[in-house]
């Protein structure tokens, strides 16, 4: 998605050409008003004249008239069903069935002109639910849930289908990766139940993932988990960085799932019965074990381990590592290694008197996610599971290491599987430990520092969000468990903050509004003062501790 102001034709064309050169295959621009949408004509014309024919998408919030204007000039319209017609007021009320139908009739009346225009002019449409911006109507009936996200999109899609329009794409984005994964899975189940003619493409993304390694890991957990499940046709990695930096990360995530050039018939394996509900998160409740004074399992945090040599090398850095210090070595864990397909490996586990830590053997020709899902399905619940990022240490390298680890371990954590994690793909024990804790942080499994919801910036952003995010992180990263949202604008920012404790939101050019939960409490603060005022606000609400 472009970060340039949509009214600035030259800047948008330059950025779009850079994205196309980097390999971006679809380019999205914000169109927050009809005037912004009208300039898409100039942008599209200049791009086509420059030989760039990458499809353009207009991103629409709140403004049906902007959508109608944008549809004249671009190949695709993205609407948010949470705010295309409904205005979010955070009101709590009960809707009778009759009142709910009246609201749907109003929605149909507002939405129909856009559907008919797109149908007649060959435009595509993405119906993109966002967890943080569900309408009051949906929230009051379905709650702030994956079910609400899916129903919100299905309502719009049904109207489109009634008008014989089918050029639809769905997305179910959230900053909480467990919610995101559950919502996409629920969407697929719902589409399957509605019938084979509901087989529409699906666009993947973790909204407000942030920047740096945190943003990449969070995106890899959410997007990678779904790609592993066979879900997804397009994807966008939302980083609080220059847009062109998102593209190589997207390719690294998608490359393992691209169709093979080999002509061999695919090999199918019987699916084991799952030991968990893939549509609702629930932690697998194993027994309780003790390893060298460290409790594992029942109601304990997921532990981080590293290979023996690395663990002992880190002992001199214990103070510097702080909360990111691995708690155990692989040898101390004394995990039982098994092939989850082999009855001879699994039968002895039934004879053990006490809960034991079990893991999958290295070297097996199995994808880690499938191997550990099978293990969880085949061993007794009382036994604990040590997750591994790879079963073939050394098989990945460079920037693929954290993305692969996040995809494999993160997917399993989102399924509630895992009592300890071992990073084998990273040879540096310090980096391996950091990676393990960062994956736990990204999945919300275990928080060792502040958590951030940071939007990737777009043409609506009213200040330098990359600089502000870096300053906020530097000032607050030590606040374990505090969640801070850094949002570019007030158009969609307050809703997209989701469950953040505090919000830092652009209110006017270079002016910041500060929020507590969804409530704005400080207004029009000059950007150069805003981080300090945010710290004061955190102190005022009793969430501040001095850094060590």
Each predicted region: which residue ranges?
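Hydrophobic faces of well-ordered beta-strands that scaffold small-molecule active sites
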Residues: 1-3, 25-29, 54-60, 77-79, ...
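Conserved, mostly hydrophobic/aromatic
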Residues: 59, 127, 170, 226, ...
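Hydrophobic or amphipathic alpha-helical targeting/insertion segments
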Residues: 53-91, 97-117, 122
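Beta-strand/loop-dominated core regions that host nucleotide or nucleotide-derived cofactor-binding catalytic loops
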Residues: 509-512, 520-543
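Glycine-rich, proline-tolerant flexible connector loops at the mouths of alpha/beta enzymes
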Residues: 3-8, 22-47, 81-102, 168-177, ...
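N-terminal active-site wall of soluble small-molecule enzyme domains
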Residues: 31-73, 311-314, 320-322
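Catalytic alpha/beta core domains of metabolic enzymes, predominantly
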Residues: 95-111, 116, 138-285, 343-486
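Short, acidic/polar
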Residues: 7-18, 62-68, 153, 219-223, ...
């Amino acid at each position: 998605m472009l970060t340039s102001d949509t009214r600035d034709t030259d800047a948008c064309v330059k950025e779009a050409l850079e994205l196309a050169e980097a390999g971006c295959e679809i380019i999205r621009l914000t169109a927050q008003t009809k005037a912004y949408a009208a300039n898409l004509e100039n942008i599209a014309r200049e791009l086509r004249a420059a030989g760039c024919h990458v499809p353009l998408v207009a991103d629409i919030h709140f403004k049906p008239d902007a959508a109608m204007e944008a549809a004249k000039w671009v190949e695709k319209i993205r609407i948010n069903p949470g705010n295309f017609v409904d205005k979010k007021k955070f009101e709590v009320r009960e809707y009778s069935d009759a009142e709910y139908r009246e609201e749907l009739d109003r929605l149909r009346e507002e939405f129909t002109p856009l559907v008919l225009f797109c149908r007649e002019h060959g435009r595509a449409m993405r119906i993109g639910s966002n967890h943080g911006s569900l309408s009051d109507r949906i929230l009051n009936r379905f709650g702030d849930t994956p079910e609400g996200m899916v129903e919100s999109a299905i309502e719009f899609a049904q109207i489109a289908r009634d008008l014989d329009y089918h050029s639809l794409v769905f997305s179910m984005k959230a900053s909480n990766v467990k919610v995101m994964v559950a919502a996409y899975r629920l969407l697929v189940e719902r589409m399957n139940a509605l019938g084979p003619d509901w087989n529409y493409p699906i666009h993947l993304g973790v909204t407000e993932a942030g920047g740096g390694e945190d943003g990449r890991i969070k995106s890899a957990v959410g997007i990678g988990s779904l790609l592993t499940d066979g879900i997804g046709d397009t994807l966008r990695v939302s980083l609080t960085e220059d847009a062109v930096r998102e593209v190589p990360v997207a390719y690294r995530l998608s490359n393992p799932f691209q169709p093979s050039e080999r002509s061999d018939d695919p090999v199918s394996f019987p699916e084991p019965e799952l030991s968990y509900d893939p549509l609702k998160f629930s932690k697998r409740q194993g027994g309780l074990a003790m390893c060298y004074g460290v409790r594992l399992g029942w109601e304990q945090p997921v532990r981080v381990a590293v290979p023996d040599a690395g663990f002992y090398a880190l002992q001199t850095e214990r103070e510097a590592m702080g909360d990111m210090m691995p708690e155990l070595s692989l040898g101390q864990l004394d995990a039982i290694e098994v092939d989850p397909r082999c009855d001879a490996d699994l039968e002895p586990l039934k004879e053990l008197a006490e809960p034991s830590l079990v893991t999958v053997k290295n070297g097996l020709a199995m994808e880690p996610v499938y191997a550990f899902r099978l293990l969880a399905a085949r061993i007794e619940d009382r036994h604990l599971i040590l997750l591994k990022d790879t079963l073939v240490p050394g098989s990945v390298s460079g920037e693929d290491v954290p993305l692969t680890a996040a995809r494999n371990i993160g997917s399993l954590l989102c399924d509630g599987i895992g009592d300890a994690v071992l990073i084998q793909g990273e040879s540096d024990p310090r980096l391996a430990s950091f990676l393990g804790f960062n994956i736990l942080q990204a999945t919300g499994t275990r928080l060792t520092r502040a958590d951030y919801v940071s939007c990737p910036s777009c043409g609506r952003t009213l200040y330098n969000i990359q600089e502000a995010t870096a300053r906020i992180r530097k000032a607050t990263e030590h606040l374990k468990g505090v969640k801070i949202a850094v949002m570019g604008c007030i158009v969609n920012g307050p809703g997209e903050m989701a469950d953040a404790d505090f919000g830092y939101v652009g209110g006017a050019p270079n002016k910041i509004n500060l929020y507590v939960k969804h409530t704005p409490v400080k207004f029009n603060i000059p950007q150069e003062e805003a981080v300090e005022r945010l710290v004061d606000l955190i102190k005022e609400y009793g969430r501040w501790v001095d850094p060590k």
